[in-house]
Curated annotation (Swiss-Prot):
Its main location: secreted. The lineage of its organism: Eukaryota, Viridiplantae, Streptophyta, Embryophyta, Tracheophyta. GO terms for biological process: defense response to fungus; killing of cells of another organism. Residues 1-28 form the signal peptide. GO terms for cellular component: extracellular region. Transmembrane segments: none annotated. Disulfide bonds join C34-C52, C40-C57, C45-C59, C81-C102, C87-C107, C95-C109. This is Defensin-like protein 295. It comes from Arabidopsis thaliana.
Amino acid sequence: MASKITFVFLVVVVINCAMMLSMPTAEAHNFLPCVITNDCEYHHCSSGTVLCVNRQCHCSRSSTHQTKLDNLKKMDYAKKCKWTKDCDPRMRFTCVSGSYMCFDGLCTCTN
């Protein structure tokens, strides 16, 4: 009886280890804090580019927007503003919701 329990326990441990080793190869979501994209320069992306989205560094995988992303990477999203119209309209490409506004004097993505 004890040998069956030990065998089942070992099988469970082996299965759990195999599942942990077979994690998908997609990048882990390490959300580093940022204010502008330049704050993410040390965040490694295996493919695509890194962007500051909603104050967190994210890896972008879209190759169709690569030119836009290269331009956006150089932009300063902490731009000071008085009105939403003062914000750079290209900012909508990096906002998850696609919208942004002037909040507390800074251009900020909205949820």
